[in-house]
Each structure stands twice: as C-alpha cells, then as structure tokens.
Regions:
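A generic structural signal for well-ordered coil/turn residues at beta-strand boundaries
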Residues: 8-11, 139, 150-152, 187-188, ...
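Generic N-terminal amphipathic, Lys/Arg-enriched alpha-helix
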Residues: 12-21, 40-46, 269
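Glycine-rich beta-strand-to-loop/alpha-helix junction loops that act as flexible
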Residues: 17-19, 74-82, 195-196, 273-275
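N-terminal amphipathic/basic leader segments beginning at the initiator methionine
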Residues: 1-14
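Proline/glycine-rich low-complexity loops and linkers
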Residues: 84-216
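An accessory alpha-helical subdomain
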Residues: 189-280
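Glycine- and acidic-residue-enriched helix-capping/strand-helix junction motifs
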Residues: 21-31
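N-terminal small/polar loop signature for handling phosphorylated ligands or for N-terminal nucleophile
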Residues: 29-99, 110-117
C-alpha cells in the first residue's frame, strides 16, 4: 500500500499574551525567537498578535486563530493565578468545557514530588497549595499535552472543532512522552499553548515543530535577494516593482526605505523573495 501523503502545513502565527508586554514592563522575546525557530526549518511566520490580559480580547483572538486554519503558537497566561485566563478563553473559543487532563495531572504531581524531595520534606498531595497547582492541568476537553522539559508542567494543543474547521489525524504523529494518545494535526491547523517563560516556551515550541510538522520543513525554500538603491523615491520605483511581480508571479517584491542607516545613509533596499529557482 502507498502511504497517504502528509497533510499540508498552513501558515504559522503567533499570539503573545500578557499585560506586562503591552505596558513595557517586560520586553517580548518570543517574536524574534519564533521567527528564528521557523526559519531554521525552512518555515516563516505569517502574522503575530499581542493581547493583554482581557478575557474578551483573548477569546476573540483565539477564535480568529482557530477559524484561520493556521498553525498558531500562543504564549503566556496558562498558569493558575487570577490573571491567567488563556485556558478558560481557549475553552470558550472552542465552545467546550474545561477538565483536568489525566496525564497533565500525573506530570504535575511528579513535579510536586520532585520539589518535596529536593526540599527534604514529605509530599502532601492534599495540601491546599498542591491541590491548587493541579489547576495548571485543567485544559479544554479534547486538548493534548505538550511536554515541558524544564519543570514537567505541560502546555497543551487544541484543534478546531467541526464548524470551525476539520481536524483530521496526521500521518505519523508521535505521542508525547508518557504514553498519551498521538496528537491530531488537521490540515486546518490548531493552536499550541505554552508558558510565557522563554526557558520553557522555546523548547516546547521546538518539540511541536519537530514532532508534529516535520513534513512541512523545507530548508532553503524561501530566499531573498536585494540591492541598495541610492537617490530614488519609492514612488519612482513602484512601476518597476509592479512589472517584476507581473512578469514573475512566483516572487514577492519588497522595498525597505531608510533615512539614517549607519553605513548607507538615506537609501532604499529593493529586493525579491520566493523560491530559490524563482528568485535566481
């Protein structure tokens, strides 16, 4: 039998959640890192969105992401403090209930046992703070875990329900450590939720890419070529740019003006991007 062809990987998006980013209290590091992680695999980021800790805005952003059919990473807000709303908003966006994920609960208990052991204290599962930590494993029904190599507290993946977009099984999807069911990767994408802490989020995002989307990797599939143009205005270059795109539909033309470049001064970087053959 001929194995089914891998499902296509759609566009990639990023949602960064947290008031601390929008207020400037914390500088976002996720956008450049996600661009780097995707680029190393021949992929690119199509869009990014920043959202504060407003449940209504988070829910709306997640609904748009689910409906887009894109593969989306969402960072932040999956903890168990009052200002963490992402888990609840994800359930609301999907129209499903929240429930304690069995494997997530197991991993969280393992983490609590590790902490007790490190502190030389007995593990007390019924202690109020330990019981509260299990809330970090309360995910939308149907969610699947993303392993966290830093402290075992998992993230989770959700896929569109019928009505938001079909999510069928991916060929060759691997199960996360611990024996969970294989992830479902639909050709309409899904959202992968990770913590806001880079030390946790970035290896988790890499795991998602390498485990769920390796069939989409295409190193060298997107290249750029550009030249520095002096003494020209974008308006005068526009007819040339339009002609290039008209005659070469497989490439995209870009212009990046600069007024105070330390080396070139005032100039325009004019270039094309696309597949290696088309760009050459």
């Amino acid at each position: 039998l001929v194995p089914p062809a891998p499902e296509p990987v759609g566009a990639f998006g990023l949602i960064v959640i947290g008031d601390e980013i929008l207020s400037g209290k914390r500088a976002d590091k996720h956008l450049p890192k996600v661009i780097e992680l995707l680029g190393a695999r021949g992929l690119s980021l199509a869009w990014a969105e920043y959202v504060g800790d407003s449940p209504a805005r988070i829910t709306a952003a997640l609904q748009r992401a689910f409906e887009s059919g894109d593969v989306v990473f969402s960072t932040g807000g999956i903890g168990a403090t009052p200002d963490d709303h992402t888990r609840q908003c994800a359930a609301r966006a999907l129209g499903v209930e929240l429930a304690l994920h069995p494997q997530a609960a197991e991993l969280i208990r393992e983490r609590m046992q590790d902490i007790a052991r490190e502190q030389g204290k007995p593990y007390e599962p019924d202690r109020p703070d330990n019981a509260h930590r299990l809330n970090m494993g309360v995910f939308p029904v149907g969610a699947q875990i993303i392993p966290n190599p830093y402290n075992k507290i998992p993230g989770f993946s959700c896929y569109p329900q019928s009505g938001l977009g079909a999510a069928g099984p991916s060929q060759g999807a691997k199960a996360p450590p611990g024996g969970s069911e294989p992830h479902t990767v639909g050709e309409r994408g899904g959202i992968h939720f990770v913590p806001g802490f880079p030390v946790m989020a970035w290896p988790m995002i890499e795991w998602v890419l390498d485990t769920l989307y390796p069939h989409g990797f295409a190193a060298g599939a997107w290249v750029e070529q550009s030249v520095i143009v002096f003494g020209a205005m974008e308006a005068t270059l526009t007819p040339l740019m339009e002609a290039i795109e008209r005659e070469h539909p497989l490439v995209k033309v870009f212009s990046l003006p600069s007024v105070d470049h330390p080396q070139y001064g005032r100039h325009i970087e004019l270039g094309v991007k696309g597949g290696p053959v088309a760009v050459a």
